Amino acid sequence: MPVNDGRGDGERGGLGDANSREAVLSAEGLTKSFGKRQAVADVSFELFAGEVFGFLGPNGAGKTTTIRMLVGLARPDRGRVRIGGFDLARDFARAMAHVGSIVESPDLYGYLTGRENLLHFARMLPDGAQGRIAELARLVALEERLDDRVETYSLGMRQRLGIAQALLGAPDLLVLDEPANGLDPAGIREIRRLVRQLAAERGIAVFVSSHLLSEVEQMCDRVTIIHRGRALATGPVQELLDRSSSGATRWRVKPAARAAELLIPFAADQPEVEGEESVIARVAREKLPEAVAALVREGIEIFAVEPRAGSLEEVFLDVTGGETV
């Protein structure tokens, strides 16, 4: 959704600079109810230039409602949104002039070609948007199909055209609602590449909502986990992954079942057998030599003891009390 105007070229304020630490997007205490149902409750986060920020949660968690508040399609009951330094409620046009977005699905006309769709939306924007069409078509790898009707495009091609459309206004902030939803693995990989490129090479702040744990893990720098309308965890992806592993080690041993029994006195919780030759156990570093010696004494073959990387799935299960995405 390219958004028209409210600023001249001199009002961008350098927000496309990936080294700037001024927040491109700031959400403070966002709360929204529909009747007696509270869809979003006191959600806060910041997003910086050149960063991919993941908003992770299951369907119905409050992701789309939050996005609608971020782009002015819904008014929060409480809280505020600032974009490019402008308060969204008080200075809507100037705030939204910094934003390109796809909410739920790209707004495209199937009977028009890709080029005609981009021209249609470019005409709503300040001078210069039409001149970016060829460049954006190359960026999203659609230059060879730009003059074909959109109704002939695959879902992934439509999604990439939607991203090109959202970039027509040269935004500092790109908001994408479930951009990989329904795509095949190749399509998901292409969206991931494009999003990372926009952040790294153009300094665009990218907000991505998703329920795909592995994709958020690979695509995003930081993430907020939202569940039942509440933000349960926020932080750098790697920091959350490190927290989820919390000292867990993978023991490549044989036989695994017997090794798991022997590790019980050294482990912080019940060791978990993974197959015939693998055990996951949380053993403190200072106890590792003693644990290894105990296994060797009992004739256990030890092939390796290595730190076990965490996953966003484990983080999600931990903060939600075991509920799945």
Model segments located where?
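Short, charged/small-residue-rich alpha-helical element at the C-terminal edge
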Residues: 246-319, 325
